């Protein structure tokens, strides 16, 4: 789990996302509160529940990007889901409990990586012995002389192996077969039976080992993973993963505005209000049955986001509104924001295009006037047509760089300067003509 302070988290987010300080501060505090809660004594810790967040803002202002970056910073089980992918229990489609099952799978993978790192040294030693056995098979009759000769030879080969002198030599080794497993499609409400059937097939064991011929460098890598997997206790792994989900899990639900009820409808609203009703127990706290065990959702942090262009937060059912107490409004982007997006973030758009063209031997230089004009063009198109936020920059940049990208392979050694004149020559007609910009930009 991340031990970064809120200020450090915001600083990391600033490297990738321009503006939106309120949203950054809210998620930073929420993430830090996970750490603070774990410092309390057990009795009080159980009473402290996470304050779930609802992020509200137009499309393309950074809601999803904040989630993506937060996932890397959290160092905890994290899953991002689209609210529109789910339907009410009892109808065809994914039910919301699948969110917790997927989150638990993520935790299992995360915990397995941590546990395998802990026993990596022992795994490397075991893998080394298996490679040496393939290079120098142990004698069947273990006479003293043979044993001494073999031991000295093994030490010589061990030294060469560690120095990388044998990396390209080919050997034949037995590689463990994959775990036997069967994916079972089940109707809603039958997940428990499905999990039991999957466990039954998994208990049948692994497929038999196969003898393969490969280079020592590749063989060592596979054998280390295989030996590390043997050293990890699977039951302990599941217990730790479930504990990790329950205490540190984070769920990001995108497009939650798309499941708001719109006007009066006849018949059951299974993909909107029905999904909201199913989300209630998850957000409030319930127990979900997964193939790894029972998972309590009481202390999982939920962050929801939506543009709310065709609806408003009050269109969510009141019970769900009450379970998302922290509201954060993200601001629409201005032309000056677009300019900063083009230059300031790590691996900015201009930096990406410069690096891509450099692979063809073409030098690209973006002047300040050129960047100003690109930002202004993107903002103008957003104002005149549909406002899609920073995503408009991708469309404008791709259109601007189209000719250079096509001809770059034939113009190695050339240099192009993207200034205001170049931008005007390539984009002015499209930006000024509303019909063209609507269909092309």
Swiss-Prot record:
Q: Which GO terms describe its biological process?
A: protein unfolding; proteolysis involved in protein catabolic process
Annotated Gene Ontology cellular component terms:
HslUV protease complex
Q: Which CDD domains match?
A: RecA-like_HslU
Instruction: Identify the InterPro entries for this entry.
Output: AAA+_ATPase (IPR003593), ATP-dep_Clp_protease_ClpX (IPR050052), ATPase_AAA_core (IPR003959), Clp_ATPase_C (IPR019489), HslU (IPR004491), P-loop_NTPase (IPR027417)
Q: Which domain of life is it from?
A: Bacteria
Binding annotation for ATP: 18, 60-65, 254, 319, 391
Which NCBIfam families does the entry mention?
hslU, PRK05201.1
| Purpose of the protein | ATPase subunit of a proteasome-like degradation complex; this subunit has chaperone activity. The binding of ATP and its subsequent hydrolysis by HslU are essential for unfolding of protein substrates subsequently hydrolyzed by HslV. HslU recognizes the N-terminal part of its protein substrates and unfolds these before they are guided to HslV for hydrolysis.
Q: What is stated as this protein's family in its record? A: Belongs to the ClpX chaperone family. HslU subfamily.
* Complexes and interactors: A double ring-shaped homohexamer of HslV is capped on each side by a ring-shaped HslU homohexamer. The assembly of the HslU/HslV complex is dependent on binding of ATP.
Supply the name of the protein: ATP-dependent protease ATPase subunit HslU
Taxonomic lineage is:
Bacteria, Pseudomonadati, Pseudomonadota, Gammaproteobacteria, Alteromonadales
């Amino acid at each position: 789990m991340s031990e970064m302070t809120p200020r450090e988290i915001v600083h990391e987010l600033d490297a990738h996302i321009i503006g939106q300080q309120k949203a950054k501060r809210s998620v930073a505090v929420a993430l830090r509160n996970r750490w603070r809660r774990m410092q309390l004594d057990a009795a009080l810790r159980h009473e402290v529940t996470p304050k779930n967040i609802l992020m509200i803002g137009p499309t393309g202002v950074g809601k999803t990007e904040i989630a993506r970056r937060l996932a890397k910073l959290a160092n905890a089980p994290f899953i991002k889901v689209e609210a529109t992918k789910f339907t009410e229990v009892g109808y065809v489609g994914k039910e919301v409990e699948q969110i917790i099952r997927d989150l638990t799978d993520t935790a299992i993978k995360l915990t397995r990586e941590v546990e395998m790192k802990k026993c990596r040294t022992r795994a490397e030693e075991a893998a080394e012995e298996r490679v040496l056995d393939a290079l120098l098979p142990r004698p069947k009759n273990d006479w003293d002389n043979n044993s001494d000769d073999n031991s000295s030879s093994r030490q010589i080969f061990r030294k060469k192996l560690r120095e990388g002198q044998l990396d390209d030599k080919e050997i034949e080794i037995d590689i463990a077969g994959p775990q036997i497993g069967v994916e079972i499609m089940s109707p809603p409400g039958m997940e428990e039976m499905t999990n039991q059937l999957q466990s039954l097939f998994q208990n049948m064991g692994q497929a038999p080992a196969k003898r393969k011929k490969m280079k020592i460098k590749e063989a060592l890598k596979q054998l280390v993973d295989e030996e590390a997997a043997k050293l990890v206790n699977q039951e302990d792994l599941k217990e730790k993963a479930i504990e990790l989900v329950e205490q540190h899990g984070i769920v990001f639900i995108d497009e939650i505005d798309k499941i708001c009820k719109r006007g009066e409808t006849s018949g059951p609203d299974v993909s909107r209000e029905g999904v909201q009703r199913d989300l209630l127990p998850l957000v409030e706290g319930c127990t979900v049955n997964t193939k790894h065990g029972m998972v309590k959702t009481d202390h999982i942090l939920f962050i929801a986001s939506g543009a709310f262009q065709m609806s408003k937060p009050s269109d969510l059912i009141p019970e769900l509104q009450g379970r998302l107490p922290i509201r954060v409004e993200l601001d629409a982007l201005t032309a000056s924001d677009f300019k900063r997006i083009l230059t300031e973030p790590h691996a900015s758009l201009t930096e990406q295009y410069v690096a891509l063209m450099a692979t063809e031997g073409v030098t690209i230089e973006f002047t300040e006037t050129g960047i100003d004009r690109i930002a202004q063009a993107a903002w103008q198109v957003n104002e005149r047509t549909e406002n899609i936020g920073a995503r408009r920059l991708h469309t404008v940049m791709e259109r601007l760089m189209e000719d250079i990208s096509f001809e770059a392979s034939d113009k190695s050694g050339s240099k192009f300067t993207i200034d205001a004149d170049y931008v005007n020559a390539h984009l002015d007609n499209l930006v000024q003509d509303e019909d063209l910009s609507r269909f092309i930009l």
